[in-house]
Amino acid sequence: MEVAMVSAESSGCNSHMPYGYAAQARARERERLAHSRAAAAAAVAAATAAVEGTGGSGGGPHHHHQTRGAYSSHDPQGSRGSREEEATRTEKKKKLHHRQSSFPHCSDLMPSGSEEKILRELSEEEEDEEEEEEEEEEGRFYYSEEDHGDGCSYTDLLPQDDGGGGGYSSVRYSDCCERVVINVSGLRFETQMKTLAQFPETLLGDPEKRTQYFDPLRNEYFFDRNRPSFDAILYYYQSGGRLKRPVNVPFDIFTEEVKFYQLGEEALLKFREDEGFVREEEDRALPENEFKKQIWLLFEYPESSSPARGIAIVSVLVILISIVIFCLETLPEFRDDRDLIMALSAGGHSRLLNDTSAPHLENSGHTIFNDPFFIVETVCIVWFSFEFVVRCFACPSQALFFKNIMNIIDIVSILPYFITLGTDLAQQQGGGNGQQQQAMSFAILRIIRLVRVFRIFKLSRHSKGLQILGHTLRASMRELGLLIFFLFIGVILFSSAVYFAEADEPTTHFQSIPDAFWWAVVTMTTVGYGDMKPITVGGKIVGSLCAIAGVLTIALPVPVIVSNFNYFYHRETENEEQTQLTQNAVSCPYLPSNLLKKFRSSTSSSLGDKSEYLEMEEGVKESLCGKEEKCQGKGDDSETDKNNCSNAKAVETDV
């Protein structure tokens, strides 16, 4: 029975008993069985000896020996086998007499039996013991603390690795039913080992990483973590890589759990995309050349130094001046003179002969090159061009530089000036070639001048609010596309309906379905200019339905856009707090070296570990720099506080 029990356990299906305590239990069970069998054998041997002592004459046994001898003379092989069997029986009888002397008090407890039966039981017992010894030598189960000696610890009872990376290689469990118990803050989970082994780089999938959380007393892994989050973590292993956040778990808490269980950056990024956030851009590397690095920091990172902050202020002022000039030149007081100057520069003298204002402009020598607006525009373009060329020279990667949307905006804001300048020079060199060509050149110049309005987006390089707005719009492209699609369907539907509803009205404003597009857009967006309105009852009903549908259409995607805006706003706020903390920490000479290394290695990204951020903040508060700030901020302190502050200053002096 014991052999069957051991083989069943070693086949790989009973993995819930602690390995060390299971070995101890088996050892105690074997010891009890050995004592009970020895006592029974001693009792039977005593009874047999008593029967043989009262059996009469000694001829009986002598007769048996003669019979066996006669039989063995006819069969030599049988005689040899019988002699070996006789020797075995004699040896076992000696063991019986030895056990009888060890347990003389058990002779009255067991009934008498035949010698053959006793020998058969002893033979089975020895075979069982030999099989158990072979299994222990093969390493099917661990030894108990008695086998290890008095110096055995719980760490010795943990599953050992043979170096092959298999984890529990010394325990021959079957992969199909080897199970593991995981305790998360008192909530027990049970799964198969092969399920966790699908992701060997994670905390639960790597035997070496999870061993530190193993509890040998209960044969389970204990994690003092968030319990509701582990349902999704375990489902990640069971589903082969699908990570879904539980509804009752906040986003930041679940993100911390994903990082703790080391599911990987790819799983975290995929989870963030499923939650509706855009994939974060990788941190841009700095140039390797020290000179280029300093230039890049000056023009790209205004917060890096005071000169960089000054360059950013100059850039913002130039952008504002350019935008103001772009708006002022469209005033009627300046627009007429500027158009005449451009016409004179283009060679349109014949058209301006009858213009009363033309002679004084032409006689005064006004050209586009001495126009005040052109001069100010030239100064702004010189700065924009200088800034763009320097940043292009010092950038770490030319390919990434020209792919950046901000740099594309810089190019678009610079090109119109050079195109306009080239067109003016070509017109002066070629002279007037007809009114049609002049009209064409004026139209092109107006379009090119309109492109200059994109310079306002250059402010987003120095404005956190515009950056947050840009991130929000980019993260909400799916919702914005859905909103536009719904509006498109509504415009087509309601413009057609109002056209046919107003078709019989002679004074209607809706002469065609395309004419009704404007009314449908204005009504669905709840603007309602009133320039076009339905007159009939049917048209008014259609207008009412159009307004209600517009409210519902716009209201559905708006919460998602607002949620994205709140996320980017809070992320930027936390980023500013973390940057301020980092600057204060680096300037503190009394901060521990391990925390100082974290501060210096931390980037400007606000997606860092929140626990690490809190740890760094606590380190700053507990350092001598934090105590110094407390001492400076207090006016009326107790005697103990004054002594603490003086001691802190003394320590600073010693340092």
UniProtKB/Swiss-Prot annotation:
Biased segments, Low complexity type: 36-50
InterPro entries: BTB/POZ_dom, Ion_trans_dom, K_chnl_volt-dep_Kv, K_chnl_volt-dep_Kv1, K_chnl_volt-dep_Kv1.4, K_chnl_volt-dep_Kv1.4_TID, K_chnl_volt-dep_Kv1.4_TID_sf, SKP1/BTB/POZ_sf
Post-translational modification: N-glycosylated.
Glycosylation site positions: N354
Stretches the record annotates as Disordered: 24-153, 631-655
Composition bias, Basic residues: 91-100
Residue spans of biased composition, Basic and acidic residues class: 81-90, 139-150, 631-642
Membrane topology category: Multi-pass membrane protein
Domain of life: Eukaryota
SUBUNIT field: Homotetramer and heterotetramer of potassium channel proteins. Interacts with KCNAB1 and KCNAB2. Interacts with DLG1, DLG2 and DLG4 via their PDZ domains. Interacts with SIGMAR1. Part of a complex containing KCNA1, KCNAB1 and LGI1. Detected in a complex with KCNA1. Interacts with KCNA2. Interacts (via cytoplasmic N-terminal domain) with KCNRG.
Family: Belongs to the potassium channel family. A (Shaker) (TC 1.A.1.2) subfamily. Kv1.4/KCNA4 sub-subfamily.
Cited PANTHER family: POTASSIUM VOLTAGE-GATED CHANNEL SUBFAMILY A MEMBER 4, VOLTAGE-GATED POTASSIUM CHANNEL
Protein name: Potassium voltage-gated channel subfamily A member 4
Organismal lineage: Eukaryota, Metazoa, Chordata, Craniata, Vertebrata
Gene that encodes it: Kcna4
